[in-house]
């Protein structure tokens, strides 16, 4: 059915109340399609993100300027209430000295375009929080198809398959394309959104809040973002995750108190922790399967 036939098939009440004519509908559709293709050809190409120092909670000046580049993972550590979430919020809104911390965020060395701050579609930052639940009554595949089609991807089916495969690989419990979104567990929801943000979203900056509480494979999640060239900032209390980044920011009293570059010695510590973590994950899976603890323990290396 072409557009003219579709227009003629509508009840006169719907045509009248909509405020459209056949010509204006055709013009609006053409403009929408053109805008979709422009957005698909011109993704946000970010070269760097700079975070200029602001002030601590007591008003004292912050000491560190941060320079972030695509493919970099930066971990944010500090006690609860130290200001980790404030830093993430400043980056999310590309703060320009208009937040309590007085920080400024520069995009490619310059102040950001206002639409990158205030337009939902044009914003450069995606955030994955601790609590994520779906309210749409759709199957997983239908939801992913909607997102893929909105990005004007040439092969939406292939994009959906890649996102679903990545999400299932990260989740503790498998789920399928026909699973309703509202029936996903917290970990499954988080895995789906991580895969979606990495593989479908054009946002070049991703903020993640305490992924260790998500019930997902943390290593797979981080690797997915790095492979796609995202700038990743990760707030965490997990020692393995804290050692998995290129550097980590120590937050104290609302300010960046220290920047620690990952050293070879820390890389070795991370490898040891990773082996321990894999053994612990195996023990966890054995308990889920109902195996006796002593049998599982004898097979694992601690």
Where do the PLM segments sit?
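GG-anchored amphipathic helix commonly corresponding to the ABC/SMC/Rad50 NBD signature/C-loop
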Residues: 186-206
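Conserved catalytic segment of ABC-fold P-loop ATPases
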Residues: 243-251
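Conserved ABC ATPase signature
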Residues: 178-184
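ABC ATPase nucleotide-binding domain signature region
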Residues: 88-150
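N-terminal pre-Walker A segment at the start of P-loop NTPase domains
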Residues: 35-60
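Conserved beta-strand-loop-alpha-helix hinge in the C-terminal portion
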Residues: 254-288
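Walker A/P-loop
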Residues: 80, 85
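Short hydrophobic beta-strand immediately N-terminal to the Walker A/P-loop
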Residues: 74-76, 88
């Amino acid at each position: 059915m072409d557009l003219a036939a579709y227009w003629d098939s509508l009840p006169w009440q719907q045509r009248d109340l909509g405020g459209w004519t056949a010509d204006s509908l055709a013009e609006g559709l053409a403009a929408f399609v053109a805008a979709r293709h422009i957005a698909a050809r011109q993704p946000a190409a970010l070269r760097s993100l700079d975070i200029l120092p602001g002030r601590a909670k007591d008003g004292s000046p912050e000491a560190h300027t941060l320079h972030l580049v695509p493919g970099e993972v930066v971990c944010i550590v500090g006690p609860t209430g130290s200001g980790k979430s404030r830093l993430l919020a400043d980056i999310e809104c590309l703060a320009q000295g208009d937040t309590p911390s007085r920080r400024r965020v520069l995009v490619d060395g310059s102040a950001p375009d206002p639409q990158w701050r205030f337009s939902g579609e044009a914003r450069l930052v995606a955030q994955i929080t601790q609590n994520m639940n779906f309210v749409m009554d759709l199957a997983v595949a239908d939801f992913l198809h909607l997102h893929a089609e909105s990005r004007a991807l040439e092969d939406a089916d292939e994009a959906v398959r890649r996102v679903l495969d990545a999400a299932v690989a990260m989740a503790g419990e498998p789920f399928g394309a026909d699973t309703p979104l509202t029936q996903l567990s917290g970990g499954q929801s988080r895995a789906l959104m991580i895969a979606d943000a990495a593989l479908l979203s054009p946002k070049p900056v991703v903020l993640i809040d305490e992924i260790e509480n998500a019930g997902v494979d943390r290593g797979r999640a981080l690797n997915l973002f790095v492979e796609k060239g995202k700038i990743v900032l990760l707030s965490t209390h997990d020692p393995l995750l804290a050692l998995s980044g290129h550097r980590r920011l120590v937050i104290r009293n609302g300010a960046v108190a220290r920047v620690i570059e990952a050293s070879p010695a820390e890389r070795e510590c991370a490898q040891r922790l990773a082996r321990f973590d894999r053994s612990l994950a195996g023990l966890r899976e054995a308990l889920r399967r109902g195996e006796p603890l002593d049998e599982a323990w004898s097979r694992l290396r601690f």
